[in-house]
Design a protein with these regions (language model features):
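A short acidic (Asp/Glu
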Residues: 149, 224-229, 250-254
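Short, surface-exposed basic-aromatic patches at helix termini and helix-loop junctions that form
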Residues: 228-237
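Dynamic "connector" segments at or just before major functional cores
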Residues: 1-189, 193-208, 233, 369, ...
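Acidic/histidine-rich, metal-coordinating catalytic segments
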Residues: 141, 212-222
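An anionic, glycine-rich sequence signature occurring as long contiguous blocks
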Residues: 1-7, 11-14, 238-336, 395, ...
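Basic, amphipathic alpha-helical segments enriched in Lys/Arg and hydrophobic/aromatic residues
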Residues: 341-403
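Short amphipathic alpha-helical "interface-anchor" segments enriched in bulky aromatics
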Residues: 28, 74, 314-348, 353, ...
Length: 427
């Protein structure tokens, strides 16, 4: 490195933290992590309690936001001054909790508490609006969280060729806000299960926003005939979901398909057509509007179907709006940057709580990006970039009698953005 000098390395730096982004988290006035902690009943003898549940949940979420998803990381990071201060302790205060204490918390929760936390996620999403929106879109999808042990309800999924859980996540399709993460067994959700979950979420939202139009958008796994029947008696609920192809559907578009193939052969140019027709499957109570997209290119024929309650717009308009749900894959990817597919606990309830913690990390980071870093390049960062460039910033912490100083590097790549965020959060 330097041929004329010897290199010496030690680990004796002053109070330096590599998790400087936690300073921003600590300045947030009311984080979802603190709200989650307040829902957990504490039956411990308070005379012997050293770590409150609020501190523990904030510690865990803070670690996740910095890329330390494992409870084992508590043993090292409990000494970190930035992490301490983000949960409300001074750098000179006793250390935070260790891995065994954190693991006991994860395995402590019962169904009632988990239900309350799920409701909290929806409430917190709604509180992010100044007033009831005219319309929201519920983008719903499931994703795999592979398991490698004997976790409860971990099942073999033939599609992924792995033992896994299948968490279901609901995002606001208009802005990427996380509404609810929900852990599910490792199989595809059945139609009735989907209806039961979505009905509860929509009814919960409509209690506060009775006149908000809510549209469900999902792939064919979320085509629930129970849900479609239910929407007929609920004026402010709509849906557009994928629909698996079958011989009956193919027969209905046979004429249009032959015409599209003929046009491609004559003009040697890609052909894309949209058609709308009525269809009723055997399990459906009512006929529904189905839209088919027929695409013929030199790579072959591509046919897709969707079913929708929208009877007003043109087929192409409805289909293009449905295609916007593809952005949700990026939001799921963002959630997984926080290792939201790490389900190492043996108990299903403990893993459910872990998913909520990962979700809390996503919500906190989203709020920081959209509010504290608004109109900066950081606002459009992926969660991976946000973690690496902002959360994992070096900070030197100096604690005096009357103040604490956080010193970031003067050469930080995003110095101006962090300065703006600090000003915004301190206002």
């Amino acid at each position: 490195m330097l041929p004329d000098k010897k290199i010496q390395v030690d680990f004796n730096a002053p109070d330096l933290s590599s998790n400087g982004g936690l300073v921003l988290v600590g300045l947030m006035k009311e984080s979802i992590a603190r709200k989650v902690a307040r829902l957990i009943p504490d039956h411990r003898n308070q005379l012997f309690v050293q770590h409150s549940y609020e501190e523990m949940v904030c510690q865990r979420v803070g670690q996740i936001m910095c890329g330390y998803e494992d409870a084992n990381d508590c043993d090292r990071l409990r000494h970190d001054s930035a992490l301490k201060m983000s949960v409300g302790r001074k750098a000179s205060d006793p250390d935070l909790c260790s891995q065994p204490t954190m693991t006991r918390l994860e395995n402590h929760l019962d169904k009632k508490t988990l239900w309350a936390i799920a409701e909290l996620f929806v409430k917190d999403y709604m509180s992010s609006f100044d007033k009831a929106p005219r319309k929201i879109i519920l983008d719903v999808d499931d994703t795999n969280a592979n398991t490698y042990g004997a976790q409860q309800l971990s099942l073999f999924n033939d599609y992924y060729d792995e033992y896994c859980y299948m968490p279901m996540v609901i995002f606001d399709g208009m802005n990427g806000k996380l509404i609810l993460p929900l852990l599910r067994p490792g199989r595809r959700n059945k139609s009735l299960n989907i209806f039961g979950i979505l009905r509860r979420v929509i009814e919960f939202i409509h209690k506060e926003w009775p006149h908000t139009m809510i549209e469900l958008r999902g792939d064919s796994h979320f085509c629930s005939h129970e849900f479609m029947d239910w929407t007929r008696t609920h004026l402010y609920v709509k849906f557009t979901t994928g629909l698996s192809g079958n011989p009956v559907l193919m027969k209905k578009i046979d004429k249009q398909l032959r015409r599209a193939k003929g046009d491609f052969e004559r003009h040697h140019a890609d052909v894309r057509r949209y058609y709308s027709f009525e269809y009723k499957a055997k399990s459906w109570t009512y006929k529904q509007r189905v839209i088919a997209k027929i695409e013929v290119t030199d790579k072959g024929v591509n046919i897709r179907f969707i079913v929708t309650s929208n009877r007003n717009n043109k087929p192409e308009t409805v289909y293009r709006r449905y295609c916007k749900r593809g952005t949700m894959e990026l939001w799921i990817k963002d959630l997984k940057y926080f290792r939201a597919d790490r389900m190492s606990c043996s108990s299903f309830k403990a893993n459910m709580f872990r998913l909520f913690l990962y979700g809390a990390a996503y919500v906190t980071a989203y709020r920081l990006k959209s509010k504290a870093f608004s109109n900066t390049e950081v606002e459009v960062f992926t969660m991976d970039s946000f973690m690496k460039r902002i959360m994992l910033s070096a900070v030197f912490i100096t604690e005096k009698k009357t103040f604490v100083r956080f010193s970031f590097s003067p050469h930080h790549r995003h110095l101006e953005a962090i300065s703006q965020a600090l000003t915004s959060l301190s206002a």
